[in-house]
Amino acid sequence: MRCDRVWSKARLATFAAGRPGIGVVEDGVVASLSGRIVYAGPATEAPAFEALETLDCEGRWITPGLIDPHTHLVFGGDRAREFELRLAGATYEEIARAGGGIVSTMKATRAASEGELVASALPRLDALIAEGLTTIEIKSGYGLSLDDELKSLRAARALADVRKVSVTTTFLGAHALPPEYEGDPDGYIDHVCYQMIPAVAAEGLADAVDAFCEGIGFSRAQTRRVFQAARERGLPVKLHAEQLSNLDGAALAAEFGALSADHLEHLDGAGIAAMAQAGTTAVLLPGAFYFVRETRLPPIQALRAAGVPLALATDCNPGTSPLTSLLLTLNMAATLFRMTVDECLAGVTREAARAIGRLDHIGTLEAGKSCDLAIWDIERPAQLVYRMGFNPLHARVWKGL
């Protein structure tokens, strides 16, 4: 078999559907051609390779490149002062209603140029890449005007031009009510549906549309309108749902065949059943749970029992999860949410790919998929979840290089 590169003498965690658990292959080989995997499996079953380069992994573990399926990586400014206020007793809702929160970041984002947004996001992206990230989802949602939302999405896309990483973008215009629409949330949703989404779609700047369905965000009826507008433009949807209360957002997301519903601390049985039936992935965000000192756990066992796919993400954002470590996210998910090692690792590979609609292309070590790899100096995969402040990444491969 002709190929560009071969990684031999490796232990693989393939996450392939046909293998149990995380798909372990003890004596494994991965081969790539033109950026795609052409073989991933046991050395004893591998064809004869004609390779330009063969790399001896010396028994190291190879997983798919890590995927962060929920971030707000592009934003202006900083919210460290709000962190101090929260430590002094202020709640997320109190800070938001006092003009802080998302709106304060909106002002800084509007004031920044596209280039400035790219420059400020790069250190955050680099921190994730340093831990084996190869694909990231990035939302807009801090511009909250047509021009500034477009600027934010362009900045997110531009990150893929300056780093070897795949970026998927999500339009989150329905994130918060901008000051110019104070007292008129329906008027703002009109703007999102009739001006913003058509413009975003026309420029091809978004791979999906998201909304914040919450008491301090937008109602279920308003979210439905956003989803209908997205559907008319052929864009899949995602939803911030049931984080602070239960507005039946997850069930609404499932009704529209959403890729994912995210947060879910207040999710109920009806929402779980709807997600399971629709095949909507649950994206769990332990960093936000930790940072805002939430006490209500997402219903992990009920989601697990219903067969809802479980993905994990950093939720990197300036206000409620300034987290740029997927490895720490793994430990938080295991420690706080009682997820298993296998669930955690699948949550940042296979299930994360599912959550962004890219499972046909990334997320597992299988022939035909992008050759995105993370190569680790570990004895067993559990060490990626168990250790904190520990980065055993040996090498990262993106599209075969």
UniProtKB/Swiss-Prot annotation:
<feature type="binding site">
    <location>
        <position position="319"/>
    </location>
    <ligand>
        <name>N-formimidoyl-L-glutamate</name>
    </ligand>
</feature>
<dbReference type="GO" id="GO:0050480">
    <property type="term" value="F:imidazolonepropionase activity"/>
</dbReference>
<feature type="binding site">
    <location>
        <position position="70"/>
    </location>
    <ligand>
        <name>Fe(3+)</name>
    </ligand>
</feature>
<feature type="binding site">
    <location>
        <position position="315"/>
    </location>
    <ligand>
        <name>Fe(3+)</name>
    </ligand>
</feature>
<dbReference type="GO" id="GO:0019557">
    <property type="term" value="P:L-histidine catabolic process to glutamate and formate"/>
</dbReference>
<feature type="binding site">
    <location>
        <position position="79"/>
    </location>
    <ligand>
        <name>4-imidazolone-5-propanoate</name>
    </ligand>
</feature>
<dbReference type="GO" id="GO:0019556">
    <property type="term" value="P:L-histidine catabolic process to glutamate and formamide"/>
</dbReference>
<feature type="binding site">
    <location>
        <position position="70"/>
    </location>
    <ligand>
        <name>Zn(2+)</name>
    </ligand>
</feature>
<dbReference type="Pfam" id="PF01979">
    <property type="entry name" value="Amidohydro_1"/>
</dbReference>
<feature type="binding site">
    <location>
        <position position="243"/>
    </location>
    <ligand>
        <name>4-imidazolone-5-propanoate</name>
    </ligand>
</feature>
<keyword id="KW-0963">Cytoplasm</keyword>
<protein>
    <recommendedName>
        <fullName>Imidazolonepropionase</fullName>
        <ecNumber>3.5.2.7</ecNumber>
    </recommendedName>
</protein>
<keyword id="KW-0378">Hydrolase</keyword>
<feature type="binding site">
    <location>
        <position position="142"/>
    </location>
    <ligand>
        <name>4-imidazolone-5-propanoate</name>
    </ligand>
</feature>
<feature type="binding site">
    <location>
        <position position="142"/>
    </location>
    <ligand>
        <name>N-formimidoyl-L-glutamate</name>
    </ligand>
</feature>
<keyword id="KW-0479">Metal-binding</keyword>
<keyword id="KW-0408">Iron</keyword>
<comment type="similarity">
    <text>Belongs to the metallo-dependent hydrolases superfamily. HutI family.</text>
</comment>
<feature type="binding site">
    <location>
        <position position="320"/>
    </location>
    <ligand>
        <name>4-imidazolone-5-propanoate</name>
    </ligand>
</feature>
<dbReference type="GO" id="GO:0008270">
    <property type="term" value="F:zinc ion binding"/>
</dbReference>
<keyword id="KW-0369">Histidine metabolism</keyword>
<dbReference type="InterPro" id="IPR005920">
    <property type="entry name" value="HutI"/>
</dbReference>
<dbReference type="GO" id="GO:0005737">
    <property type="term" value="C:cytoplasm"/>
</dbReference>
<keyword id="KW-0862">Zinc</keyword>
<feature type="binding site">
    <location>
        <position position="315"/>
    </location>
    <ligand>
        <name>Zn(2+)</name>
    </ligand>
</feature>
<dbReference type="InterPro" id="IPR011059">
    <property type="entry name" value="Metal-dep_hydrolase_composite"/>
</dbReference>
<dbReference type="InterPro" id="IPR006680">
    <property type="entry name" value="Amidohydro-rel"/>
</dbReference>
<feature type="binding site">
    <location>
        <position position="72"/>
    </location>
    <ligand>
        <name>Fe(3+)</name>
    </ligand>
</feature>
<comment type="function">
    <text>Catalyzes the hydrolytic cleavage of the carbon-nitrogen bond in imidazolone-5-propanoate to yield N-formimidoyl-L-glutamate. It is the third step in the universal histidine degradation pathway.</text>
</comment>
<feature type="binding site">
    <location>
        <position position="175"/>
    </location>
    <ligand>
        <name>4-imidazolone-5-propanoate</name>
    </ligand>
</feature>
<comment type="pathway">
    <text>Amino-acid degradation; L-histidine degradation into L-glutamate; N-formimidoyl-L-glutamate from L-histidine: step 3/3.</text>
</comment>
<feature type="binding site">
    <location>
        <position position="240"/>
    </location>
    <ligand>
        <name>Zn(2+)</name>
    </ligand>
</feature>
<dbReference type="InterPro" id="IPR032466">
    <property type="entry name" value="Metal_Hydrolase"/>
</dbReference>
<feature type="binding site">
    <location>
        <position position="317"/>
    </location>
    <ligand>
        <name>N-formimidoyl-L-glutamate</name>
    </ligand>
</feature>
<feature type="binding site">
    <location>
        <position position="72"/>
    </location>
    <ligand>
        <name>Zn(2+)</name>
    </ligand>
</feature>
<feature type="binding site">
    <location>
        <position position="240"/>
    </location>
    <ligand>
        <name>Fe(3+)</name>
    </ligand>
</feature>
<dbReference type="GO" id="GO:0005506">
    <property type="term" value="F:iron ion binding"/>
</dbReference>
